[in-house]
């Protein structure tokens, strides 16, 4: 059994990690940490996990083969040296996803720049071989995951793309702020990041395409839809051929329906799963491609992708512990 610890398990992604790992047939959870909730049972914070015999601790002296760092951005770089060499590490924050120059442009100074190059970017569909050999993996951001996987097959067709993102409230994390309380958040379609979103850096690094994000908060608890626009003069068949690079990927579903409500990806149909649904439309008259990609931001955009990376790192079947379909209706 793989001994797993989750550092920062009180947040939404931390809770989903605990849920997925608790059901994983090859994993034993040895520790879940939280400074705020140390000593409390896990269901006091994550009520859906009632019956799971785990308590939060604030002690980092635990036995683990893999450590998931589910802490806020900027925290991993402060604490990571406590864990280096003791276990494989999967970092859920942005601290080690991008190279030093890009990090400083989008986030500011980095406290441990010498460690960045030791991390592998944890997008299995693109870096499976590297992840298999890695000791340190940086889990991608949710917006970046949806955009990179949607854009990557077409990266040679354009140098720029406009990306419209519709994101749910859970993407903002669990910390209290005025924008997330129900009277302010309910029924909104709110622009909150019209340009220079930090996840643009991950897209640029992975695709070499300059992606210009505009992010909207919408009235969903979980789920994310990326609509990616770029110019293209060609034929639709070639676009489909490029997208079929994913045809053997266990968690990529290519949506090609020509009619009905489900003819394009919709986050409603991936909730609770590690799937990403990708489809496209081609406006030949105006030489415009629209790629649509939908994920559950907490699963394929977070905890599920981390478990997928863990499976690869430990030589397990990649889908182990993730072999379930989305819940419906939601």
From Swiss-Prot:
Its EC number is 1.2.1.103, 1.2.1.106. SMART domains: Semialdhyde_dh (SM00859). It holds the Pfam family Semialdhyde_dhC_1. Signal peptide: none annotated. The active site is at residue 142. NADP(+) binds at residues 10-13, 297. InterPro entries: AGPR_AS, AGPR_type-1, LysY, NAD(P)-bd_dom_sf, NAGSA_dehydrogenase, Semialdehyde_DH_NAD-bd. It catalyses: [amino-group carrier protein]-C-terminal-N-(1-carboxy-5-oxopentan-1-yl)-L-glutamine + phosphate + NADP(+) = [amino-group carrier protein]-C-terminal-N-(1-carboxy-5-phosphooxy-5-oxopentan-1-yl)-L-glutamine + NADPH + H(+); [amino-group carrier protein]-C-terminal-gamma-(L-glutamyl-5-semialdehyde)-L-glutamate + phosphate + NADP(+) = [amino-group carrier protein]-C-terminal-gamma-(5-phospho-L-glutamyl)-L-glutamate + NADPH + H(+). GO terms for biological process: arginine biosynthetic process via ornithine; L-arginine biosynthetic process; lysine biosynthetic process via aminoadipic acid. The keyword Transmembrane does not apply. One of its GO terms (molecular function) is NADP+ binding. The gene is lysY. GO terms for cellular component: cytoplasm. NCBIfam families: argC. It comes from Pyrococcus furiosus (strain ATCC 43587 / DSM 3638 / JCM 8422 / Vc1). Belongs to the NAGSA dehydrogenase family. Type 1 subfamily. LysY sub-subfamily. Involved in both the arginine and lysine biosynthetic pathways. This is Putative [LysW]-L-2-aminoadipate/[LysW]-L-glutamate phosphate reductase.
């Amino acid at each position: 059994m793989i001994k797993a610890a989750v550092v920062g398990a009180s947040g939404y992604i931390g809770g989903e990690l605990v849920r997925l790992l608790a059901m994983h047939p090859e994993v034993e959870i040895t520790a879940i940490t939280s400074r705020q909730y140390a000593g409390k049972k896990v269901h006091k914070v994550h009520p859906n996990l009632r019956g799971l015999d785990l308590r939060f601790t604030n002690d980092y002296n635990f036995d683990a083969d893999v450590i998931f760092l589910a802490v806020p951005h900027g925290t991993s770089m402060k604490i990571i040296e406590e864990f280096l060499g003791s276990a494989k590490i999967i970092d859920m924050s942005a601290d080690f996803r991008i190279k030093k120059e890009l990090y400083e442009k989008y986030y500011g100074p980095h406290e441990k720049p010498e460690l960045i190059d030791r991390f592998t970017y944890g997008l299995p569909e693109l870096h499976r071989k590297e992840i298999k050999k890695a000791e340190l993996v940086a889990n991608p951001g949710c917006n970046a995951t949806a955009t990179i996987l949607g854009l990557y097959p077409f990266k040679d067709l354009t140098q720029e793309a406009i990306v419209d993102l519709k994101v749910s409230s859970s993407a903002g994390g669990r910390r209290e702020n005025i924008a997330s309380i129900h009277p302010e958040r309910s029924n909104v379609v709110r622009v909150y990041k019209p340009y220079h979103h930090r996840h643009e850096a991950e897209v640029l690094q992975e695709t070499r395409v300059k992606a210009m994000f505009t992010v909207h908060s919408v009235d969903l608890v979980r789920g994310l839809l990326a609509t990616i626009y770029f110019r293209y003069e060609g034929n639709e068949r070639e676009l489909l051929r490029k997208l079929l690079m994913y045809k053997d990927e266990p968690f990529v579903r290519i949506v090609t329906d020509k009619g009905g409500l489900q003819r394009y990806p919709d986050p409603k149909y991936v909730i609770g799963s590690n799937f990403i649904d990708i489809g496209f439309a081609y406006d030949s008259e105006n030489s415009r491609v629209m790629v649509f990609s939908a994920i559950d931001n907490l699963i394929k955009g977070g905890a599920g992708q981390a478990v997928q990376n863990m499976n690869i790192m430990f030589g397990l079947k990649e889908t182990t512990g993730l072999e379930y379909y989305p819940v419906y209706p939601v």
